């Protein structure tokens, strides 16, 4: 036995050694295998990284090259775009020039026609009046002869009676008594006749007053309506701004929220990826450990069984116990060996399991079957799913070795049976514990726990240790039982051990799964995602659905089938992933990362989608908030944690999705509900996992597909959103701009492309999933189809929108790839698509999100939200229209709206720039259009408004980031808009001009209609237009079209009216000229945009005011006593305060509201008022109607201000004064003037004395040369007259200047008077111009002064008489220079005023309107006298000078504002032709008013002359009768109204505290008188005459402004006046070049100077109107030529007047005068030039009026330049020339006054204008306005009176009127 035992022991030891060797070898081999596998994995990773890096580098290099290429292309395109833009601008400028030239030509033609009509009407009326007077004279002579014959007969009879002497006396007594009785009867009859005539005149006056009151009431109502509409507009604008701010705030909030969400999503994504990698590593390690442990345990069991079998055979039963006891050590050894191996594996796992494990692991883990049970083929088959995991090779390596060991030690059959049969018993056992113990919980949540392992290695450790302990215990038990068992039983025991170990493995996995549950894995999601797959596979395999998923999976057929089905599912899911990946790659290279994430996400979805959310939830659980704490909980707590995490994730995802994907919101909400139901049912799962599975199947099916679908979309969207937001957040503004800009173009293509691809991918995924799930779940498909439909419907709806946008965006989206920003934008495009236009623009996000949200989720909700948003964004809009509109329509329309908005915005901007310059109508139309468009835009869907904002942003960003196409498109849009503007304005201008002409005719015809009807109609039309514009806000497209139509209609109407008032395009009449076009187009575009706004506002306001003022002044004429009744002091302070405040207030209001309906209303009102004025003029030729709009308006304002008791008192006083003035117009004026002068002397004496003295001395000196005695006498007379006139007002001083004596003297010295007037006119204009020219360039003044000096020199050379004029002219030049300083100061003041609230603009406007009137009056009157007396030589000189002045003045356009007003007034006056008012109503109102005033002055001077001299009386008698007749009364009232208006306007213009005298330097101001007195001219009253309001006005105006602004300038002006030639260069506003240029065209005078001052605006308007005036001047010159022809001598007066203008623009008026002198054509040209000067001044020599005339054209070029230099002054001068020529001839005093008037007009001081008129016409007692009216009639029938005769003045007044018409 011992040998046997030893042998057996030896064998046993041998076997033990073999076993040890085997185990050692196995261990070494395994270690080597691990090392090799680790090395292999590292090599693989390195190789993969290298290749990937190489590819990435190559791709990056290629992309960089592509980007560089795209950038180069972009830059090239931008260069091309810029070139095209420049070309486009040049073309647009040329088109604008052509259009303006065309418009000017048409307007000039219309003005010429109107002028001709006006002259014809005036001549006809005058002829009728002359005929009536002649008839009356004949009747009187006949009656006188009869009486004489009768008396002679009686006388003859008496001596025949032979009675004795005693009886002789008694006989004689009866005869004497009878004779006395007869004489008494005759006298009484004459008295009765006179009383009847007076009563008739009073009745007519009352009727006129009633009509005026009606017109005033209509104007007030219209103003109230306008104010109300303006308030409404302001409120709407404020509301719109608030809404925009609110939208901006929301946009910012949206940006912040998106940034926060992006950061949160990025953090979650990173956490998710980290958790996924950790889970993958843990699961991989756990799986490998489990596989290794099970394989080792199986091998150990096999070896144990083999050893026990051998021991059982070799050992006796007694030893068996020992043997059995000895085996635990090996087992323990093995066990401990296993643990180190596991630990070692755990350490090796990180190397073996790269992060790539994340996606494949779930697939490998999908099957609960342990890896070692799977055949090697199965593992090999499974390995492909493990992308880069070297684990399967490692697990395969030990298995063959184990198999080899088994093959060596174990019988072949046993091994085969083990392999084949082991799985069944193993699974048999596994079924029981899993179903009984662990599976219920595991199956509750997900059904597939084996797939999920603990998150932490810590979770793996506990199961491993228990597992090992269990194995140890069971192995010990099995070993003990085996020791006592038979060898055959040992095999069964071995298999039992295998089963138990398998069961323990299952338990370990279950425990792992439980821990996963405890750790809060989203088992619900897992079930939802995994359950369907497994259940589908099980159902497809025919397995019972009630069996637990694990049981089914544990079964071998179920295992294999599950593996196959899972692989199929994963493959099907992968295929969509791949497909999706490929299109995504094709979509964008930037989305490569997003695609990878999508791959992972899709793979995760394919795993079960649940894993994705488990991971995210695990991530959140891993987060300190939930992780470790929740991991410790079990069962429901875990489920609750899972729920909370799920809900949080869902909420975060939902909120993110809702913001980013509103369309998905609905499906997500349903999914959430389903998930909640699933959660609730999952909670019930522990009860019956099978039932839960059944219940879950439909839910899972429904949830899985939508969840997969939505999760895939969410992942895609989130990733895209993250990337795009990151990119978009890089520069949200740039992104927004680009996204906005490229949204329609760039985004549409990528959006459509990406949407299509996304749709394709989604459909492929859905189809593939449906195919993979078809057989198992048709119900799921149905449910999912419903979800799909729900999801797809909004998606399709939105995708359709997106596609529409994408189609539009395709072009630029292609370019978007060119630049990284565009690529970012492209990334933003899918965001916008996926966010469904939520990111379309951060601005639109709110509205668009709401729209998309509401439309996708709830169309009703969308309606509500949209309505709210739209209500906020578009208060006027009907939200239902936009909200109810389909997104497709909105999207389709949105691009169209965007384009339209772009067109509209661009066209608006361009139209504003060009048309504002072009015409008030265009500007107003566009002003109406922009609000309409804006409101329309606001009415448009928020997308459209946002798009508009985007368009603005795009335009701005396009400057920096414009893609070539975008720029080209913009240029195209610009071109289209320009073309539209050019064509439309050209065609519309032609039509409008035609309409304007026809309208003017109709107006002249309809002018007889009541103003109320017209105003009501116009206001009704305005209201209709406003209402229509508001209504248009309601309809978007229709509204736009309507707006265009309406705007075109109002534009046409307004243009017609404006053409009548001041052709809007006359604003840039000089633009066509190449130099001035370039300079002035540029400057005028800038300046005119500004100035035109100011000037147009002022012009429109002044025109409105003037119309109102005219209406008021007509009321004033009715109650002209207001002005006259007021002491000059009262009037002046009233003017200063009331007029200033009123003028300033309306100017401010109107200036502030220039762009509003006010402009149209004002323009409409102006034409209406002008028509009413024309009606008045037609009715009575009342100078009232002729009154300048500014004066009228001012007078209206004054009347309104004073309307209370003052009006009544004034009316009474006016009546009394009117009667007195009719009786003694000159004396009354003189008295007033004296009063005013006395009152003003104290104030102004100090101010104006020095300058005035110097000027007076210079003027006297000059006149002394010409004819000091006459000048002195005239000066005295004028002084007296001026005193009265100044006391009466600026107009009265004119009359007084031209009082009978001064007129006689002036007639005697018409040259001197003209000269004096000229200096005044020049001085005033120059003062004004110098202010303007100061702004522009001092050169203008100096140029004009030089021109004036040259003109004066020329005049001196031409005539010695003219020398007197020249002296005045020189004086005027000096004054002009001095006034130019004054004017500059005035302009500076005006500029300051403009800078101020707009009072000064108003003042400037008032001054402009006032100045034109005064200049006309004084210039006309003076022009008549001075012109007549000065002679043609002087007129020629003036004509040349005037032409040069016009040319010189032509340069500066700033003055057109005045001229516009002047021209507007003149045009209005001229248009009515028969009624000067009618021309006055259009634009000529002021000019006519001026001219009429000069004419009135001339008439009044005639009237004064009747007082002063027989000729004056002769001429004046005719005129005075008219003046005193209907016209005189009307003129007086009108002139008083003008005085009031001028005073008011002047007061408004001037600070309340500043005496009018300071501003006006009017005789009213003491300084003026002192200056005038000190300056005493040779005429004796040189003070009045020398300072004669013209000189004073010139000097005074210059002085007051100067004193206020340049106190020293007044002195300088006087000194300068002495040395005007030198001083001209010294003038602050006039550089020497200007003076040098005086002879030449002073191109120096260009709008630049106007830019410098607010007055530039006013004068710019005048200049524009002046340009218009020039255009009109061409007509006027035609008419004026006719007028000038019969004005023949007028040119000299015109020369004098020209000097006035020239000194303001000396050459201008001289040129004008020269035009008149050179020939009748020239005189007409001179008239036109004067008018043109005015117009040119107003035009600022936009086009030299002279140029309109033959020589006046050339001269006007020079004079235009001079005017350009002297713009405003020249304008005034030109106005003065019109009237000034007459004045000059009739009396220089008025001319000086005209200058003052002009100066005042330029300074915005109509008072001076009024004074000039009064001075000229004081004799008649008719205000200049009245005189203007009278003159207008006289113009109608120009009387060729001797140069000394006032009729000449009247004629010159007529010419002035005709000129006014011409100017019109």
Curated annotation (Swiss-Prot):
PROSITE patterns: IF_ROD_1, IF_ROD_2
Region (Tail): 315-1864
Region (Coil 1B): 56-151
Compositionally biased residues, Low complexity: 1713-1722, 1741-1755
Stretches the record annotates as Linker 1: 44-55
Chain segments carrying region Linker 12: 152-174
Region (Coil 1A): 8-43
Residue segments, region Disordered: 437-492, 515-625, 680-845, 916-1113, 1129-1158, 1175-1344, 1375-1722, 1735-1807, 1841-1864
Modified residues (Phosphoserine): 312, 356, 359, 565, 575, 623, 688, 731, 775, 841, 862, 894, 963, 1010, 1021, 1106, 1127, 1177, 1188, 1195, 1216, 1290, 1541, 1565, 1656, 1665, 1745, 1747, 1837, 1860-1861
Region annotation (Linker 2) ranges: 194-196
Keywords: Acetylation, Coiled coil, Developmental protein, Intermediate filament, Neurogenesis, Phosphoprotein
Family membership: Belongs to the intermediate filament family.
Record protein name field: Nestin
């Amino acid at each position: 036995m011992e040998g046997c035992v030893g042998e057996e022991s030896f064998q046993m030891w041998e076997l033990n050694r073999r076993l040890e060797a085997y185990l050692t070898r196995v261990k070494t081999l395994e270690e080597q295998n691990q090392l090799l596998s680790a090395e292999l994995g590292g090599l693989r990773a390195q190789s993969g990284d290298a290749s990937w890096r190489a590819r990435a580098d190559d791709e990056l290099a290629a992309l960089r090259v592509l980007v560089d290429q795209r950038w180069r292309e972009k830059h090239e395109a931008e260069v091309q775009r810029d070139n095209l833009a420049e070309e486009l601008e040049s073309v647009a400028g040329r088109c604008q020039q052509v259009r303006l030239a065309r418009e000017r030509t048409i307007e000039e033609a219309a003005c010429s026609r109107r002028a001709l009509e006006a002259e014809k009407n005036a001549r006809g009326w005058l002829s009728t009046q002359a005929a009536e007077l002649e008839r009356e004279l004949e009747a009187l002579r006949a009656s006188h002869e009869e009486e004489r014959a009768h008396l002679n007969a009686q006388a003859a009879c008496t001596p025949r009676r032979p009675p004795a002497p005693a009886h002789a006396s008694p006989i004689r007594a009866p005869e004497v008594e009878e004779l006395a009785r007869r004489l008494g009867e005759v006298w009484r009859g004459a008295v009765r006749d006179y009383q009847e005539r007076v009563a008739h005149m009073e009745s007519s006056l009352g009727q006129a007053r009633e009509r005026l009151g009606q017109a005033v009431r209509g104007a007030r109502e219209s103003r109230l309506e306008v104010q109300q509409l303006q308030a409404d507009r302001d409120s709407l604008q404020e509301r719109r701004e608030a809404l925009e701010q609110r939208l901006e705030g929301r946009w910012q909030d949206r940006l912040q929220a998106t940034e926060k969400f992006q950061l949160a999503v990025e953090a979650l994504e990173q956490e998710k990826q980290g958790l996924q990698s950790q889970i993958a590593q843990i699961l991989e390690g756990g799986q490998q450990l489990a596989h290794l442990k099970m394989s080792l345990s199986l091998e150990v069991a096999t070896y144990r069984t083999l050893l026990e079998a051998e021991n059982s055979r070799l050992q006796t039963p007694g030893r068996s116990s020992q043997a059995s006891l000895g085996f635990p050590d090996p087992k323990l050894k093995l066990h401990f060996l296993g643990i180190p191996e596991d630990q070692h594996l755990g350490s090796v796992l990180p190397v073996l399991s790269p992060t790539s494990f994340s996606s494949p692991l779930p697939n490998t883990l999908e099957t609960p079957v342990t890896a070692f049970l799977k055949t090697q083929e199965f593992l090999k088959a499974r390995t492909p799913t493990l992308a880069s995991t070297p684990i399967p090779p490692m697990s395969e390596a030990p298995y063959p070795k184990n198999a080899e060991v088994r093959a060596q030690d174990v019988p072949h059959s046993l091994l085969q049976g083990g392999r084949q049969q082991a799985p069944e018993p193993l699974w048999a056992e596994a079924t029981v514990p899993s179903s009984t113990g662990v599976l219920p919980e595991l199956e509750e949540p997900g059904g597939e726990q084996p797939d999920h392992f603990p998150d932490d290695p810590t979770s793996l450790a506990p199961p491993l240790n228990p597992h090992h302990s269990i194995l140890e215990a069971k192995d010990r038990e099995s070993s003990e039982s085996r020791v006592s068992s038979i060898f055959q039983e040992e095999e069964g025991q071995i298999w039992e051990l295998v089963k138990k170990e398998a069961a323990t493995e299952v338990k370990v996995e279950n425990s792992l799964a439980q821990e996963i549950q405890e750790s809060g894995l989203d088992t619900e999601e897992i079930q939802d995602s995994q359950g369907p797959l497994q259940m589908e596979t099980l159902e497809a395999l025919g397995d019972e659905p009630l069996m637990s998923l694990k049981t089914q999976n544990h079964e071998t057929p179920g295992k294999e089938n599950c593996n196959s089905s899972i692989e199929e599912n994963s493959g099907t899911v992968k295929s969509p992933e791949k497909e999706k990946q490929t299109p995504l790659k094709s979509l964008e290279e930037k989305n490569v990362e997003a695609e990878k994430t999508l791959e992972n996400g899709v793979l995760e979805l394919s795993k079960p989608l649940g894993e994705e959310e488990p991971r995210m939830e695990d991530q959140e659980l891993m987060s300190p908030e939930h992780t470790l704490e929740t991991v410790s909980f079990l069962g429901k707590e875990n489920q609750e944690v899972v729920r909370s995490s799920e809900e949080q994730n869902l909420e975060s995802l939902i909120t993110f999705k809702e913001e980013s994907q509103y369309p998905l919101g609905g499906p997500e909400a349903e999914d959430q509900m389903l998930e909640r139901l699933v959660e609730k049912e999952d909670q019930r799962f522990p009860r019956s996992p099978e039932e839960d599975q059944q219940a879950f199947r439909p839910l899972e099916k429904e949830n899985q597909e939508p969840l997969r679908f939505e999760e895939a979309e969410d992942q895609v969207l989130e990733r895209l959103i993250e990337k795009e937001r990151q990119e978009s957040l890089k520069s949200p503004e740039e992104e927004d701009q680009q996204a906005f800009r490229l949204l329609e173009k760039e985004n549409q293509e990528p959006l459509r492309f990406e949407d299509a691809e996304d749709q394709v991918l989604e459909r492929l995924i859905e189809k593939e999933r449906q195919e993979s799930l078809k057989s198992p779940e048709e119900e799921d498909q149905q449910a999912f189809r419903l979800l799909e439909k729900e999801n797809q419907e909004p998606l399709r709806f939105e995708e359709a929108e997106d596609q529409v946008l994408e189609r539009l965006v395709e072009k630029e989206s292609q370019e978007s790839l060119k630049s990284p920003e565009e690529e970012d934008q492209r990334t933003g495009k899918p965001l916008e698509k996926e966010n469904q236009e939520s990111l379309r623009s951060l601005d639109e996000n709110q509205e668009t999100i709401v729209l998309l949200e509401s439309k996708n989720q709830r169309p009703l909700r969308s309606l509500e939200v949209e309505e709210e948003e739209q209500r906020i964004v578009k208060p006027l809009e009907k939200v239902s229209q936009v909200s109810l509109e389909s997104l497709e329509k909105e999207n389709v329309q949105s691009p169209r709206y965007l384009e339209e908005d772009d067109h509209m915005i661009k066209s608006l901007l361009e139209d504003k720039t060009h048309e504002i310059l072009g015409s008030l109508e265009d500007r107003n139309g566009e002003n109406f259009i922009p609000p309409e468009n804006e409101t329309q835009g606001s009415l448009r869907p928020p997308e459209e408004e946002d798009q508009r904002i985007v368009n603005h942003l795009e335009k701005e960003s396009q400057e920096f980031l414009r893609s070539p196409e975008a720029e080209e498109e913009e240029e195209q849009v610009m071109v289209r808009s320009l073309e539209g503007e050019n064509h439309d304005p050209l065609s519309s201008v032609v039509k409008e001009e035609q309409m304007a002409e026809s309208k003017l005719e109709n107006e002249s015809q309809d002018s007889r209609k009541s103003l109320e009807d017209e105003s009501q109609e116009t206001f009704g039309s305005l209201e209709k237009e406003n209402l229509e514009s508001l209504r248009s806000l309601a309809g978007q497209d229709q509204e736009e079209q309507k707006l265009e139509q309406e705007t075109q209609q109002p534009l046409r109407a307004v243009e017609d009216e404006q053409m009548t008032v001041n052709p809007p395009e006359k604003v840039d009449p000089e633009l066509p000229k190449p130099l001035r076009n370039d300079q002035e187009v540029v400057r005028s575009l800038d300046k005119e945009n500004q100035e035109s706004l100011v000037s147009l506002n002022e012009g429109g306001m002044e025109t409105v005011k003037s119309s109102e003022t005219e209406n008021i002044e007509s009321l004033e004429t009715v109650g002209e006593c207001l002005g006259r009744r007021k002491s000059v002091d009262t009037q002046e302070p009233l003017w200063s305060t009331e007029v200033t405040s009123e003028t300033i207030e309306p100017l401010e209001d109107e200036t502030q509201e220039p762009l509003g309906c006010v402009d149209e209303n004002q323009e409409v009102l102006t034409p209406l008022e002008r028509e009413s004025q024309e009606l008045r003029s037609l009715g009575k030729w009342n100078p009232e109607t002729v009154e300048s709009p500014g004066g009228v308006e001012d007078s209206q304002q004054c009347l309104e201000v004073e309307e209370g008791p003052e009006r009544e008192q004034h009316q009474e006083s006016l009546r009394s004064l009117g009667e007195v003035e009719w009786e003694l117009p000159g004396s009354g004026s003189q008295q007033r003037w004296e009063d005013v002068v006395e009152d003003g002397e104290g104030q102004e004496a100090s101010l104006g004395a020095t300058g005035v003295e110097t000027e007076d001395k210079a003027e006297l000196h000059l006149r002394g040369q010409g004819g000091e005695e006459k000048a002195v006498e005239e000066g005295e007379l004028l002084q007296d007259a001026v005193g009265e006139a100044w006391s009466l007002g600026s107009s009265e001083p004119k009359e007084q200047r031209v009082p009978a004596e001064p007129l006689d003297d002036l007639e005697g010295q018409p040259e001197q008077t003209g000269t004096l007037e000229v200096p005044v006119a020049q001085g005033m204009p120059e003062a004004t111009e110098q202010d303007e020219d100061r702004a522009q360039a001092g050169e203008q003044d100096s140029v004009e002064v030089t021109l004036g000096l040259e003109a004066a020199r020329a005049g001196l050379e031409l005539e010695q008489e003219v020398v007197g004029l020249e002296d005045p002219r020189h004086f005027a030049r000096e004054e002009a220079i001095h006034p130019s300083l004054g004017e500059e100061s005035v302009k500076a003041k005006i500029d300051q005023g403009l800078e101020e609230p707009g009072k000064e603009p108003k003042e400037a406007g008032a001054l402009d309107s006032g100045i034109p009137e005064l200049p006309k009056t004084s210039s006309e009157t003076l022009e008549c006298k001075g012109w007549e007396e000065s002679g043609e030589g002087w007129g020629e000189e003036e004509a040349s000078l005037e032409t040069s002045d016009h040319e010189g003045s032509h340069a500066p356009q700033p003055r057109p504002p005045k001229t516009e007003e002047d021209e507007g007034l003149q045009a209005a006056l001229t248009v009515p032709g028969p009624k000067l008012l009618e021309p006055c109503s259009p634009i000529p109102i002021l000019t006519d008013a001026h001219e009429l005033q000069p004419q009135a002055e001339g008439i009044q001077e005639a009237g004064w002359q009747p007082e002063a001299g027989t000729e004056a009386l002769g001429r004046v008698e005719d005129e005075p009768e008219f003046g005193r007749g209907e016209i005189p009364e009307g003129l007086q009232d009108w002139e008083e109204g003008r005085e009031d208006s001028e005073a008011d306007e002047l007061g408004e213009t001037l600070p309340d505290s500043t005496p009018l005298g300071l501003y006006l330097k009017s005789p009213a101001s003491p300084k003026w008188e002192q200056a005038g007195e000190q300056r005493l001219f040779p005429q004796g009253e040189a003070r009045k005459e020398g300072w004669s309001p013209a000189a004073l006005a010139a000097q005074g105006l210059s002085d007051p402004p100067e004193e206020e602004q340049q106190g020293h300038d007044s002195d300088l002006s006087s000194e300068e006046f002495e040395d005007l030639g030198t001083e001209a260069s010294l003038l602050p506003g006039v550089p020497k070049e200007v003076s040098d240029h005086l002879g030449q065209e002073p191109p120096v005078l260009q709008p630049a100077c106007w830019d410098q001052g607010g007055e530039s605006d006013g004068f710019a308007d005048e200049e524009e109107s002046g340009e218009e005036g020039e255009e009109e001047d061409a007509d006027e010159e035609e008419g004026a030529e006719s007028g000038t022809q019969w004005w023949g001598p007028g040119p000299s007066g015109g020369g004098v007047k020209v000097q006035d203008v020239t000194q303001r623009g000396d050459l201008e008026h001289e040129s004008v005068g020269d035009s008149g002198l050179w020939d009748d054509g020239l005189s007409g040209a001179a008239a036109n030039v004067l008018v043109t000067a005015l117009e040119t001044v107003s035009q600022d020599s936009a086009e030299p009026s002279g140029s309109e005339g033959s020589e006046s054209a050339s001269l006007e070029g020079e004079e235009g330049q001079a005017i350009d230099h002297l713009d405003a002054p020249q304008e005034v001068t030109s106005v003065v020339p019109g009237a000034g020529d007459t004045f000059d001839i009739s009396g220089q005093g008025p001319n000086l006054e005209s200058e003052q008037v002009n100066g005042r007009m330029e300074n915005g001081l109509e008072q001076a204008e009024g004074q000039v008129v009064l001075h000229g016409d004081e004799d008649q007692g008719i205000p200049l306005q009245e005189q203007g009216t009278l003159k207008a009639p006289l113009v109608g029938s120009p009387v060729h009176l001797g140069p000394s005769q006032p009729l000449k003045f009247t004629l010159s007044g007529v010419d002035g009127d005709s000129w006014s018409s011409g100017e019109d």
